[in-house]
Amino acid sequence: MKIAIVAAMKEELHPFEAHFAPGKVVFAKGPIRFLEVHENLYLVQSGIGKANAAACAAWLCEKIQPDLIINTGTTGSFNPDFSLADVIVSTKFAYSDVDATGFDYAWGQVPQMPADYPVDKDL
């Protein structure tokens, strides 16, 4: 199984890099880095934000074709109930910066799209 572990910032990716032998740089430009640390394992620094995350995922899908992409990091969460290194597993994802409530959509729902996106239960 080919796996890509993605984090926005080098600080979020560092614990994974420290665990593996130095990887081969597959691609690096600006804040974006793709490291191959094993034949079927990639560590990816995507850069911050939805646009960078989407571009990174598209590149991964086209060039690397992973079976699984794991996104890790703070993902914008500053909940005081969470501590550094806590593992939080989501059951669904939603936008946090979309407001079409004036058109009778739920907060975070992009018009004509689902209000949220469930996680693959097999994971």
Residues covered by each model-derived region:
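Short, active-site-adjacent cap segments at secondary-structure transitions
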Residues: 12-14, 76-79
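Proline-aspartate-enriched helix->loop->beta-strand connector
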Residues: 65-70
